[in-house]
């Protein structure tokens, strides 16, 4: 995970762009770099190294004139290298590099080939494409200044004082000057009338296990968030099972006001049962109040629910990174997919239940995913969400 900034248009001072990018340095504490293209467009990148620690520095150049920046993870990058892109020469072993080569091979029509989470910008001369992953796991914003230059950034704080207007980049879309916004992600589940498959627990188990397994792709220490609820407990249990025989220690993390908090008690039971090395983090109400200004700066919202839910995650993320861990698996999305919230029981009909779950998943990027990303990335911690595979 990282922070990206791209400016389409000439005349912006490189030193200023570096300062703007540094506003997101918490997202990428490992490396920082900038590239000015021959046409005067600018790409900047703040890197949190998870895959290819030594040669994965960005911006990354393609075979010729195309350059790119990417925030996220491409889980099928090895398969793409060995099949679709087998005739291409790669400069790195980074998962991100496949993006620029897919652009070289297919032009704009490559986003649906990516299995992963991403906010990306590719610039080739005066041509460019900007895209965001299907559900908006990774944040992306765009704006325009008074001279008509376009800005794209992982966080609003990098561009707000440069743009006369800015907005959220829609998930599941790409944007080019020639096409405008194009919706590339068109899943069947968005049409409620197609929900005709019967429950298949074996298929569900296999699908979730596969989703967890692909998210273990990393070259750094990782762990699992564990609240003791069904969603995080499933993720932790599957991860533990996948690591059996590897000799790798799995760390689990939970947080609460004190050891008697219900979530901590439940999480401890799960951790003991599946055999993780468990860590309990405690914080006080006073500590929560003290960090409110800083938390709001990171979240970029005054929404009360988001701030309340992000407070423990902010403290937990800090404690996790202090133990040298850079990536965690989390249970976001399960309640929306399966109707886990209490109010779902009041659905007037099966159809209304189905429509509500669809809408909740579609809107995850406005709340839960935003909170999960920004409260963890405030401390350079990457959260991966298998339920949203």
Q: Each predicted region: which residue ranges?
A:
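Cysteine-centered catalytic environments shared across enzyme families
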Residues: 1-301
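Short beta-strand "acidic-cap" motif of Rossmann-like dinucleotide-binding folds
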Residues: 252, 328-329
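Short aromatic-hydrophobic micro-motifs that form the base-stacking/packing surface
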Residues: 68, 329-330
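Conserved glycine-rich, hydrophobic/aromatic-active-site segments
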Residues: 110, 212, 295-327, 333-388
């Amino acid at each position: 995970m990282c922070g990206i900034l791209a400016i389409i248009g000439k005349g912006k001072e490189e030193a200023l762009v570096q300062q703007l990018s540094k506003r997101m340095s918490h997202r990428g504490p490992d490396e920082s770099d900038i590239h000015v293209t021959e046409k005067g467009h600018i790409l900047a990148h703040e890197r949190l190294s998870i895959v290819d620690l030594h040669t994965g520095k960005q911006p990354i150049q393609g075979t010729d004139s195309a350059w790119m920046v990417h925030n996220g993870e491409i889980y099928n990058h090895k398969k793409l290298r060995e099949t679709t892109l087998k005739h291409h020469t790669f400069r790195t072993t980074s998962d991100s590099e496949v993006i620029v080569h897919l652009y070289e091979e297919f032009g704009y029509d490559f986003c649906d080939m990516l299995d992963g989470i991403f906010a990306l910008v590719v610039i080739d001369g005066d041509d460019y494409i900007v895209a965001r992953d299907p559900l908006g796991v990774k944040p992306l914003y765009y704006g325009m200044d008074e001279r008509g230059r376009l800005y794209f950034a992982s966080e609003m704080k990098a561009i707000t004082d440069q743009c006369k207007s800015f907005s959220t980049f829609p998930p599941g879309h790409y944007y080019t000057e020639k096409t405008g916004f194009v919706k590339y992600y068109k899943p069947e589940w968005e049409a409620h009338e197609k929900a005709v498959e019967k429950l298949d627990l074996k298929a569900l188990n296999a699908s979730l296990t596969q989703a967890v397994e692909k998210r273990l792709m990393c070259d750094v220490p990782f762990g699992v968030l564990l609240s003791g609820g069904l969603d995080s407990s499933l993720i932790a249990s599957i991860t533990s099972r996948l690591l059996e025989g590897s000799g790798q220690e799995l760390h689990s993390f939970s947080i609460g006001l004190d050891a008697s908090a219900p979530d901590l008690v439940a999480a401890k039971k799960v951790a003991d049962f599946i055999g993780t090395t468990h860590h309990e983090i405690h914080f006080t109400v006073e500590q929560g109040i003290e960090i409110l200004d800083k938390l709001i700066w990171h979240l970029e919202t005054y929404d009360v629910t988001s701030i309340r839910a992000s407070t423990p995650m902010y403290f937990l993320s800090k404690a996790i990174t202090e133990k040298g861990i850079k990536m965690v698996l989390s249970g976001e999305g399960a309640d929306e997919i399966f109707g886990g919230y209490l109010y779902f029981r009041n659905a007037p009909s099966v159809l209304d239940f189905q429509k509500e779950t669809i809408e909740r998943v579609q809107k995850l990027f406005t709340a839960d995913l935003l909170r999960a990303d920004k409260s963890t990335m405030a401390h350079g911690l990457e959260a991966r969400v298998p339920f949203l595979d």
